[in-house]
A protein has these predicted regions:
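Positively charged n-region of N-terminal signal peptides that target proteins for export
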Residues: 1-5
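Bacterial N-terminal signal peptides
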Residues: 7-17
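A short, N-terminal "cap"/entry segment at the start of jelly-roll beta-barrel domains
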Residues: 21-61, 148-151
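Double-stranded beta-helix
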Residues: 28-30, 103, 123-151
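Conserved short histidine dyad/triad with adjacent acidic residue
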Residues: 61-79, 117-118
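Glycine- and acidic-residue-biased ligand/ion/polar-headgroup-sensing regions
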Residues: 68-71, 78-99
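Short beta-strand His + acidic residue motifs that chelate non-heme Fe in jelly-roll/DSBH
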Residues: 73-75, 94-95, 116, 121-127
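Short acidic-glycine-tyrosine-enriched beta hairpin
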Residues: 98-118
Length: 151
């Protein structure tokens, strides 16, 4: 077999493997305009909206979380295998640990991207005003509260 034939066969095989990925991307396209994003949540709790996927199921999902000014999130963790967080607006104060310790909080301004390793306890505060986060992760997810240590 000459080199030209080998190259042609390799190109056809490669192109054939791309077709399902392209088709799948088109079938799962999602568009969310700002006016279509409606946050929901209980009073006193962070508000939530799912932009893509289903965080209760295995697979990729994208959520936005809105924290009202002054809202504190006590130590907890998530089971996601991969979890990245983008601070979209506001300044988010974040720390890793099982106990609330204000001195360990680090200010993450808008535009900051960070990751949360699986099952790593952390806590946060929307100290200076409203904060909006965008979470991109592999589900299923959940919030597991960390019980405070007794003195």
């Amino acid at each position: 077999m000459n080199m030209r034939a080998v190259t042609l066969i390799a190109a056809l095989c490669t192109t054939a493997t791309w077709a399902p990925a392209r088709a799948q991307t088109v079938e799962t396209s999602v568009v969310k305009f700002p006016q279509d994003i409606v946050y929901k949540g209980l009073p006193g709790a962070p508000q939530h909206v799912t932009l893509y996927g289903d965080s209760s199921q295995p697979g990729l999902y994208v959520d936005r979380i809105r924290f009202l000014p002054g809202m504190k999130v006590m130590p907890h963790w998530h089971p996601d295998t991969v979890r990245t967080v983008l601070v979209m607006s506001g300044t988010f104060y974040f720390a890793v640990g099982e106990q609330w310790d204000e001195s360990k909080l680090v200010a993450y301004p808008a535009g900051t991207l960070y990751s949360e390793p699986p099952r790593t306890p952390h806590y946060a505060w929307a100290k200076d005003g409203e904060v909006i986060l965008q979470i991109t992760a592999i589900g299923p997810t959940g919030n597991v509260a960390v019980a405070p240590k007794k003195p």
